[in-house]
């Protein structure tokens, strides 16, 4: 077993520096494409829900792909939306908290806006026509049923307010508390706090068929079971082909003293219970008798067991496979360290999780002792096993378990071994950035060169990262961040995400908004085959005319795509021609001697490295430009200060990604001698020359400051402004010559067009 000790602050810092590059030093960790909220709207790949207002807190989503609809739980509202367009045929139910409950909530010291309202936290499909719904009810949770039509076209959408019931142990009191629930066979499984203060947490089962109500919960008297648990997700997952073995798996984090120190730490867990658990006969009555839990580890292995841990579980996503018993488990974790802030994504297999639950139990003599492996005799049937006729015909229910099985599981709910990632460590990390990961969804995508899991990650600042982990030679992993998308106008904590593979859309909720986002924006990568291949997006391929959505086809090499290496030379027939003939955009730039000029070059990819080359006038060879005090390289181009005559020539801006180098733009710089400008100015009359020189000096100084401070302000725009200014000055200069004629025209117009005046009296 690997050591699970928590490194001290110094070792954490050194490990962070060892494993994780400082921001800005690794081009590969930078998102290749960064799109703003405005960019997404212009690309028609983002649809914000227009029915939202600030503070509605869109935290709960229920996706119904079969009928093409999305149920959204928010503050005092439940929305029924169209999956194709969130703003089409919107229906809503207004369900506020009772006024007396709101007053009691405020008297208890809670905030009137963020606490004392009815925040919808449960939306679970009960049957074909009804959805079970629960809201916090201003710290007095309530539950009920929403009636829906069975078909998409039906307009039924109403809450049965006559049959509301208490939501205690089904829904949290606090709207901000992490919470998980799932409906299975008409039973509601929920992990939540059972009291107003949120100290007592429990995993419960309620509801059920009318003839078979069996309320079950965790044992509050056993502190080994749960300690300050924060539930993240829960899922029904079959273990075998025998339905009697079906289990509910739940993922959470809790306070623990698993380490060798006396300090309390937060650890992530995976737990499970049997679906057919009925509680005990003489002990653990109406309590789980099959409750087990194990540690879920997401860490970077370090020297001598000093691993760098990401201990706080934030979200879980199950990626379905062909075998429903073995989905892949994707988890988002964050650090608890005060030394550095980081997030990671780890992947687990159900086979590894089951192996831990079938392994040794942990034992603790008392609260002052450490957890050790239990070496004693394990009672029969094995604690945690579901009762099944095929396993033992004499044990038909958990109420038939022997007393020693019940006693054992009360004291030994924790497994000794931990569950480790399938790949040995995280498949994705974010370190030394100003945000943390909060949500995850994953899509399994078929590409030309293989199959890839595309990961979509929500952050606490309202951005979505689109990434892919690529397996290279010798099973090494390459982490590629394809896009960083600002999906909200203002930074906002992303609290929920759902994916529709049928619609190829993400649905993302936060405190201040709800957004529908396309999984791909192939056209934004560029208009050339090379741009499409360099993107390495499994969704996109070059079809001969444009970068568009890839669809598997039987035609050999019908689409150009290279996710694994991103090599356009091997995929695009026109690349060699474009390299040899340099088919990049070409512009002519004019600069004035001794002034500054800016050569603009903005690569589409943030992962590209830029190099500048110059071919001076009258010379055959090119040389690479080196930055110095006069030549300054910026993210948006090249600033040349105190322009010299020898600076004239052709400037080539070249971008390199991986081994592929191509010219983005060619700029032909012409330097106008300062003497030419002076001789032109001497032809003007003395008065105008002095006035214009004073004005021009001030304006050029302003323009120079603007040019230096804003690299995005191109020299072309500067020259255009100068040209318009000169034209206006010339018009004003010649205006006096025609002043007399213009005055005569005005008099004539007044004489011909003045209305007749009434006679004076």
From Swiss-Prot:
It is found in: Secreted. Residues 728-754 have a biased composition (Basic residues). Residues 32-519 form the Sema domain. Disulfide bonds join 105-116, 134-143, 274-386, 298-346, 522-540, 653-719. Residues 552-670 form the Ig-like C2-type domain. Glycans are attached at residues 127, 595. One of its GO terms (biological process) is semaphorin-plexin signaling pathway. Residues 1-24 form the signal peptide. GO terms for molecular function: chemorepellent activity; neuropilin binding; semaphorin receptor binding. Pfam families: Ig_6, Sema. It comes from the Eukaryota. Developing spinal cord and developing visual system. Collapsin-1, -2, -3, and -5 bind to overlapping but distinct axon tracts. One of its GO terms (cellular component) is extracellular space. Keywords: Developmental protein, Differentiation, Disulfide bond, Glycoprotein, Immunoglobulin domain, Neurogenesis, Secreted, Signal. PANTHER family: SEMAPHORIN, SEMAPHORIN-3D. Strong binding to neuropilin is mediated by the carboxy third of the protein. Induces the collapse and paralysis of neuronal growth cones. Could potentially act as repulsive cues toward specific neuronal populations. Binds to neuropilin. This is Semaphorin-3D. It comes from Gallus gallus.
């Amino acid at each position: 077993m690997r050591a699970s000790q928590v490194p001290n602050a110094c070792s954490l810092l050194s490990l962070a520096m060892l494993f994780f590059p400082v921001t800005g030093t690794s081009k590969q960790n930078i998102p290749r494409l960064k799109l703003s909220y405005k960019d997404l709207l212009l690309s028609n790949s983002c649809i914000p829900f227009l029915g939202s207002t600030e503070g509605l807190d869109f935290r709960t989503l229920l996706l119904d792909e079969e009928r093409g609809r999305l149920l959204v739980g928010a503050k005092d509202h439940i929305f029924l939306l169209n999956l194709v367009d969130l703003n089409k045929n919107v229906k809503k139910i207004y369900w506020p908290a009772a006024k007396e409950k709101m007053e009691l909530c405020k008297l208890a010291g809670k905030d009137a806006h963020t606490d004392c309202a009815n925040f919808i936290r449960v939306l679970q499909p009960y049957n074909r026509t009804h959805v079970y719904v629960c809201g916090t009810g201003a710290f007095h949770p309530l539950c009920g049923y929403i009636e829906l039509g069975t078909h998409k076209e039906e307009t039924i959408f109403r809450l049965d307010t006559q049959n509301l019931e208490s939501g205690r142990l089904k829904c949290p009191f606090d709207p901000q508390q992490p919470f998980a629930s799932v409906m299975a066979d008409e039973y509601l499984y929920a992990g939540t706090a059972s009291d107003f203060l949120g100290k007592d947490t429990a995993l419960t089962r309620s509801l059920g068929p009318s003839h078979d109500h069996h309320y079950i919960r965790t044992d509050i008297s056993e502190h080994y079971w749960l300690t300050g648990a924060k539930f993240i997700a829960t899922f029904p997952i079959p273990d075998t082909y025998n339905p009697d073995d079906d289990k509910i798996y739940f993922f959470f984090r809790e306070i623990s003293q698993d380490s060798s120190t006396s300090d309390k730490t937060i650890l992530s867990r995976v737990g499970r219970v049997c679906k057919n658990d009925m509680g005990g006969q003489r002990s653990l009555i109406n309590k789980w008798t099959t409750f087990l839990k194990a540690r879920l580890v997401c860490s970077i292995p370090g020297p001598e067991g000093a691993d760098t841990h990401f201990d706080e579980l934030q979200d879980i996503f199950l990626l379905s496979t062909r075998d429903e018993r073995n989905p892949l488990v994707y988890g988002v974790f964050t650090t608890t360290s005060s030394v550095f802030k980081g997030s990671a994504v780890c992947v687990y297999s159900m086979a590894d999780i089951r192996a831990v639950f079938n392994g040794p139990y942990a034992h603790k003599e008392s609260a002052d002792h450490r957890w050790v492996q239990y070496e004693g005799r394990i009672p029969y049937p094995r604690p945690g096993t579901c009762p099944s006729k095929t396993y033992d015909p004499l044990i038909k229910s958990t109420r038939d378990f022997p007393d020693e099985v019940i006693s054992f599981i009360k004291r030994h709910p924790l497994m000794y071994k931990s569950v480790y990632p399938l790949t040995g460590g995280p498949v994705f990390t974010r370190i030394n950035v100003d945000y943390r990961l909060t949500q995850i969804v994953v899509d399994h995508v078929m590409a030309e060169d293989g199959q890839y899991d595309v990961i979509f990650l929500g952050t606490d600042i309202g951005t979505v990262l689109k990434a892919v982990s690529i397996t290279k030679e010798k099973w090494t992993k390459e982490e590629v961040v394809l896009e960083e998308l600002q999906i909200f106008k203002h930074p906002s904590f992303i609290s929920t995400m759902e994916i529709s593979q049928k619609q190829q859309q993400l649905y993302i909720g936060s405190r201040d908004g709800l957004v529908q986002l396309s999984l791909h924006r192939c056209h934004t990568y560029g208009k050339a085959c090379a741009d499409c291949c360099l993107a390495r997006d499994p969704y996109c391929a070059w079809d001969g005319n444009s970068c568009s959505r890839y669809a598997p086809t039987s035609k050999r090499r019908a689409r150009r795509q290279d996710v694994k290496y991103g090599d356009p030379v091997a995929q695009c027939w026109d690349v060699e021609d474009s390299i040899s003939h340099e088919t990049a955009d070409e512009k002519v730039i004019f600069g004035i001697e001794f002034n500054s000029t800016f050569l603009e070059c903005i690569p589409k990819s943030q992962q590209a490295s830029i190099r500048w080359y110059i071919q001076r006038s009258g010379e055959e060879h090119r040389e690479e430009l080196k930055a110095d005090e006069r030549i300054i390289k910026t993210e948006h181009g090249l600033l040349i200060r105190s322009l010299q005559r020898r600076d004239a020539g052709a400037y080539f801006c070249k971008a390199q990604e991986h081994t592929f180098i191509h010219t983005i733009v060619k700029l032909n710089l012409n330097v106008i001698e300062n003497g030419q400008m002076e001789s032109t100015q001497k032809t003007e009359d003395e008065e105008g020359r002095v006035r214009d020189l004073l004005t021009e000096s001030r304006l050029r100084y302003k323009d120079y400051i603007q040019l230096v401070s804003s690299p995005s302000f191109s020299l072309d725009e500067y020259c255009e402004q100068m040209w318009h200014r000169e034209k206006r000055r010339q018009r004003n200069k010649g205006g006096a010559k025609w002043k007399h004629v213009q005055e005569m025209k005005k008099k004539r117009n007044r004489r011909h067009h003045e209305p007749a005046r009434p006679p004076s009296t």
